[in-house]
Amino acid sequence: LSVHSAIAQDVVEIFTEIYNDPEQFPIHDVGGYSWRGDTATGEHNCGTAIDINANENYQIRDGQVLAGSCWEPETNPYSISPDSSVVRIFAEHGWSWGGDAWAYSSDDSEGYHDYMHFSYLGE
């Protein structure tokens, strides 16, 4: 997992806490830094975002799936639920979860969710 060096230790602590949490949330796929071109300004381009279990935690806008294939937190152990230890632990470290409506979305933020995505907000 590649992330910005300024948050690397925080990321180690987060994943250690997730691993040691009684919930034992199963993680099989993790993504972080991803260069998306000189004009891209997204958090993955800067190394300040992480995606977990992308296939089971889709990105969706107004009912149209943009990435991944499902989000079934009640039946799929790899799907991240709002009350999961993963969301709680990231939040305790100052990160936001894409499962919440994105306040900075340029269009209807209520219709956009990215359940795989966590963004570093800082302190």
Task: Mark where each language-model region is.
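Residue-identity detector for threonine
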Residues: 16, 39-41, 48, 75
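Surface-exposed patches in mature extracellular/periplasmic domains of secreted proteins
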Residues: 22-41, 97-107
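Catalytic cores and adjacent binding grooves of peptidoglycan-active enzymes
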Residues: 46-123
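Sec/Tat-exported extracytoplasmic proteins
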Residues: 15-22, 37, 56, 94, ...
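Active-site acidic/histidine clusters and adjacent loop/turn architecture
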Residues: 1-31
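Second-shell loop/turn segments in exported
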Residues: 1-5, 39, 71-79
